From Swiss-Prot:
Residues the entry annotates as binding Mg(2+): 258
Family of this protein: Belongs to the class-II aminoacyl-tRNA synthetase family. Phe-tRNA synthetase alpha subunit type 1 subfamily.
GO CC terms in record: cytoplasm
Keywords linked to the UniProt accession: Aminoacyl-tRNA synthetase, ATP-binding, Cytoplasm, Ligase, Magnesium, Metal-binding, Nucleotide-binding, Protein biosynthesis
Name the record gives this protein: Phenylalanine--tRNA ligase alpha subunit
Naturally occurring in which organism (per UniProt): Corynebacterium efficiens (strain DSM 44549 / YS-314 / AJ 12310 / JCM 11189 / NBRC 100395)
Assembly: Tetramer of two alpha and two beta subunits.
Length: 340
């Protein structure tokens, strides 16, 4: 194949490539002009049949023609790819000025909302929020809180024990271990709120769940009395349930407080009624608990209280079934919006 015929074949290929409208057409034209049966590839294969003294020049002509065609093909391909990308971007372009339907906004879970609301109340009183591990040593969960070795709360019927046997590790049954850790780590006076998730071997039903949330409070200072405890609970209750809320205390027993009491609340509910409802437990910190963390009960006193977040949400918002809070159905969460 002569130099002139090679140039002619190259020019024909270049002209054909310029006429391609898209990448698919360009690929088909490449097969026509650079495929096995096209003139330039055939000329390249025939180089072996040319006399040696002519082969060098013939090979140079073939490579020059092939190089022109390959270079132009790459240029046209780049142009068509850019064109295609512009078309795709144009098709996917979003006109942000066009009116559209309102995007559905998600909502925090009501337990999260209530947890944050309660924490904000304590922070507003100048208290700190303290947290601790959910897998806890028995010492912090029971021993330091004045639970006797044979207390029924330690049994497998009430507590999840973590293996191996004898490890003395449990899933915490309350957030009270955070109080112990805080008293060991902090200098008195101490005013902390302890929110968190706790675990007990309860069956899931309308009023119980094996995994739930608590908020506990602890104050340790000089001269604290039950009057300070009552005032703190009154303020918390009115912030949560409304200004008409009342509280009352009923004598009870807890290992970690002495004296101890159950606290009830009365408030007008969202269904138009009102009545007394058991809310949580409270009392003055047992002197044995203070001694366990190195605080002299002759110099300092303290009060503590705790209540369940799920139970608080349930009777405050008139919810009949606690299972709705744990099953993850978005239809339950959305009505609460961004505030409970």
């Amino acid at each position: 194949m002569t130099e002139a015929s090679l140039n002619e074949a190259a020019t024909a290929a270049i002209t054909a490539f310029d006429g391609a409208d898209n990448l698919e057409e360009l690929a088909a034209l490449r097969r026509d002009h650079l495929g096995d049966n096209a003139p330039i590839p055939q000329a390249r294969r025939s180089l072996g049949t040319i006399p040696k003294d002519q082969r060098k020049d013939a090979g140079r002509f073939v490579n020059m023609a092939l190089g022109r065609v390959e270079k132009h093909f790459a240029q046209v391909k780049a142009q068509l790819e850019e064109k295609r990308n512009r078309e795709v971007l144009e098709q996917e372009r979003v006109d942000v000025t066009v009116p559209t339907t309102r995007t559905q906004v998600g909502a925090l879970h009501p337990i999260t909302i209530l947890n944050e609301q309660i924490a904000d109340i304590f922070v507003g009183m100048g208290w700190e929020v303290a947290e601790g591990p959910e897998v806890e040593a028995e010492y912090f969960n029971f021993d330091a809180l004045n639970f006797l070795p044979d207390h029924p709360a330690r049994t497998l019927q009430d507590t999840f024990h973590i293996g191996p046997e004898g490890s003395r590790q449990v899933l915490r049954t309350h957030t009270s271990p955070v109080q112990i850790r805080s008293m060991l780590d902090r200098e008195v006076p101490i005013y902390i709120a302890c929110p968190g998730r706790v675990f007990r071997t309860d069956e899931l039903d309308a009023t119980h769940t094996p995994v739930f949330h608590q908020i506990e409070g602890l104050a340790v200072d000089k001269g604290l009395t039950m009057a300070h405890l009552r005032g703190t609970l009154d303020h918390l209750a009115r912030e949560l349930f409304g200004p008409e809320t009342k509280t009352r205390m009923r004598s009870n027993y807890f290992p970690f407080t002495e004296p101890s009491a159950e606290v009830d609340v009365w408030f007008p509910n969202k269904k138009g009624g009102a009545g007394w409802i058991e809310w949580g437990g409270c009392g003055m910190v047992n002197p044995n608990v203070l001694r366990a963390v190195g605080i002299d009960p002759e110099e300092y006193s303290g009060f503590a209280f705790g209540m369940g977040i799920e139970r608080t949400l349930q009777f405050r918002n008139g919810l009949s079934d606690m299972r709705d809070m744990v099953e993850g159905d978005v239809r339950f969460t959305l009505p609460f919006g961004i505030q409970a």
